[in-house]
Amino acid sequence: MTCPRNVTPNSYAEPLAAPGGGERYSRSAGMYMQSGSDFNCGVMRGCGLAPSLSKRDEGGSPSLTLNTYPSYLSQLDSWGDPKAAYRLEQPVGRPLSSCSYPPSVKEENVCCMYSAEKRAKSGPEAALYSHPLPESCLGEHEVPVPSYYRASPSYSALDKTPHCSGANDFEAPFEQRASLNPRAEHLESPQLGGKVSFPETPKSDNQTPSPSEIKTEQSLAGPKGSPSESEKERAKTADCSPDTSDNEAKEEIKAENTTGNWLTAKSGRKKRCPYTKHQTLELEKEFLFNMYLTRERRLEISKTINLTDRQVKIWFQNRRMKLKKMNRENRIRELTSNFNFT
């Protein structure tokens, strides 16, 4: 909105000074106008500067022109466009000399990185400055911000990718990790070899036991266990020797010699020493004549077949139990055969 030069302030002050216009406001002129005792001109509501009116009915002098009040013309734009009156003034572009802060403010050496959303918001604000920041302080989308001006509470070191000067920086953490693994192997290896005394001072990583040493320890532990097994077998054969015949002892010796081969290895518990065919035939023949033997007859049979009295007694007991079981099964089979389950 533009105003001509020859307009007098009377045209603006007339509605306020008129009797009809004054009725819309309070009788006192101070509600919309300052007193002109201190200043030559007063501030009118929404109209910038205007000559002060001491009384309500008194108007401005027609001889005065707007040229006498240059500040009044500067406020016409804001009076014409009310929205522009509340617009904030943007800062004028000015160069930044350096990134340093006054000594009273704490400064961090770490540069924090803004996220993608914050970079998009801070983009138009950065365009206000005519000169860019120096490269020493501004990296790739990085702005040095002190701790209390930090954009987010999270640590910036986690978001920032590490900039390593050379290959040595990468090798350092891997060497530390590698130093832990040989230590774990060193702790596990003595368990394979049996009881080994640990030294007071830990061994270095270069002194870890080689696989050949572990094999020798296992081979030493093997012969130690084998004599104990052979002694147990000999003790068992010694217990059975008075009750078994010479043929059975020979068969047991042959079995002991063949236990080393994995093809003939026996699984489960050790079976009893079986009777020979000749012994079983004589016992079966005697069982057919009489299932129960007297003491005298049992001693005679034991001498003839080279068995002890106790062995013959146990064989007859087992044979009777077997016969009883067979008779029970045959009886059940006969009973079930009479019924037709259809």
UniProtKB/Swiss-Prot annotation:
Primary localization class, coarse = nucleus
SMART domains per record: HOX
- Provide the residue ranges listed under DNA-binding region in this record: 268-327
- Any one GO molecular-function label of the UniProt entry: DNA-binding transcription factor activity, RNA polymerase II-specific
| Listed Polar residues bias regions | 1-11, 204-219
- Keyword Transcription in record: yes
Keywords, A to Z, come to: Developmental protein, DNA-binding, Homeobox, Isopeptide bond, Nucleus, Phosphoprotein, Transcription, Transcription regulation, Ubl conjugation
Asked if the keyword Ubl conjugation belongs to this entry, the reply reads yes
Q: Pfam families given for it?
A: Homeodomain
Q: Name one GO biological process term.
A: neuromuscular process
* Localization annotation: Nucleus
Query: What would be one Gene Ontology cellular-component term for the protein?
Result: nucleus
Give the sites modified to Phosphoserine.
189
Gene3D superfamilies referenced in this protein's UniProt entry, alphabetically? Homeodomain-like
Function, as annotated, reads:
Sequence-specific transcription factor which is part of a developmental regulatory system that provides cells with specific positional identities on the anterior-posterior axis.
- Would you tell me the protein name for this molecule? Homeobox protein Hox-C10
- UniProt organism field: Macaca mulatta (Rhesus macaque)
The record's gene field reads: HOXC10
